[in-house]
Regions:
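Extracellular beta-strand ligand-recognition surfaces/modules
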Residues: 39-65, 114-124, 134-136, 191-221, ...
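Extra-cytoplasmic beta-strand recognition segments
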Residues: 1-4, 37-45, 70-73, 78-79, ...
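Beta-strand acidic-aromatic groove motif in beta-rich domains, primarily in extracellular
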Residues: 3-11, 50-55, 148-159, 205-208, ...
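Extended, low-complexity, turn-rich repeat/linker tracts enriched in Gly/Pro/Ser/Thr and Asp/Glu
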Residues: 2-3, 17, 58-66, 145-149, ...
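Extracellular carbohydrate recognition and processing domains
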Residues: 13, 17-44, 83-112, 166-199, ...
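Exposed low-complexity, polar/acidic, P/S/T/G-rich flexible segments that act as propeptides
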Residues: 62-83, 149-151, 221-236, 299-302
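A charged, solvent-exposed segment within the mature domains of Sec-exported extracytoplasmic proteins
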Residues: 91-93, 113-147, 248-251, 256, ...
Length: 302
């Protein structure tokens, strides 16, 4: 049924207002809407004053929806972007879900300029020269129709000893918020100090990580850092480059060590494994972990 389909529309215009308005990229049936898609636009663009991707009627039909931009290619080449600076949702109030990638006259604009471009660190731009192509624009995105990603999440400390004794889901009441406000996403109260007390972990660890359920589905670019680690009250030194963002989709993990995970392949920040065990992560009375969630989406190096 054509009436049930969601039309995906592109607006892209340069500083002279020339470009394409409501260019139909594809019409998607409801049963095919959720998931990852690649949209292709064939044309030219010298720079972008307006750059939006619209899903006609989707915000009205699926009010609990979210669209994440995974990749943008210009003439076949991927470009960098900071999706934390995009705007998402029914921005115009007409039931249309919009991802506003750049708009000098749109949400968040000041004086017909974008205060901080998602495509560079240039401030107060009226147009974005990074968006230019001679033949083709490709946008890879993921559509989620059963959740916006906003809400309260719980970071759980997980540690497992060599005998598979475990603390699985200890959080001491910790929680943080993914806030959706003014059509943007942000992290609220995202710095933590969790202390776990036990006498069962002196032999070391085969797994130690912080885990957040369900969030990876929405924000696979979520980034956190381990700020400090204390074992039995003493601060431990470590190689911060080896404490890694990882996933057990739809769960996110800040992985200190996992004999089945990413750190098994890339090396442990705390020492050399003895088989599967990192003895340096052992403790006789307490483990205290201080960590911070920084961004929901990956931040490029400009």
């Amino acid at each position: 049924d054509a009436d049930a389909q969601i039309s995906v529309l592109l607006n892209i215009a340069d500083s002279s207002w020339a470009g394409s308005w409501d260019a139909l990229l594809v019409a998607i049936s409801p049963e095919d809407l959720a998931g990852q898609h690649t949209f292709v636009f064939e044309g030219t663009c010298t720079d972008a004053m307006v750059f939006t991707l619209d899903f006609a009627g989707m915000a009205k039909r699926y009010p609990n929806s979210f669209v994440r931009i995974d990749e943008i290619k210009l003439d076949g080449t991927s470009i960098r972007f900071d999706a934390n600076r995009f705007y998402y949702g029914d921005i115009e109030g007409h039931g249309k879900y919009r991802v506003q990638l750049f708009n000098a006259y749109g949400a968040g604009s000041v004086g017909n300029a974008v205060p901080l471009s998602p495509f560079s660190n240039v401030e107060n731009q009226g147009t974005e020269p990074a968006i230019h192509f001679k033949e083709k624009l490709e946008i890879v995105c993921t559509v989620i129709t059963d959740g916006t990603g906003a809400g309260i999440y719980t970071p759980n400390l997980v540690t497992v000893n060599p005998d598979w004794g475990s603390a699985w889901g200890y959080n001491a009441g910790a929680a943080f918020e993914v806030k959706y406000e003014n059509f943007q996403y942000s992290l609220v109260a995202s710095q933590f100090d969790i202390k776990y007390e036990s006498a069962d972990y002196a032999a070391g660890s085969i797994m130690t990580f912080v885990e957040v359920a369900d969030i990876y589905k929405y924000f696979p670019g979520l980034h956190a850092t381990l700020d400090n680690l204390y074992l039995d009250g003493k601060e431990v030194t470590f190689d911060a480059s080896k404490v890694l963002d990882a996933n057990e989709s739809p769960k996110y993990r800040l992985e200190l060590w996992n004999c089945y995970g990413t750190t098994k392949d890339k090396g442990c920040a705390f020492g050399t494994p003895d088989g599967d065990v990192i003895k340096e992560l052992g403790f006789s009375s307490s483990m205290e972990v201080k960590f911070t969630f920084h961004t929901l989406f990956s931040v490029p190096e400009w």
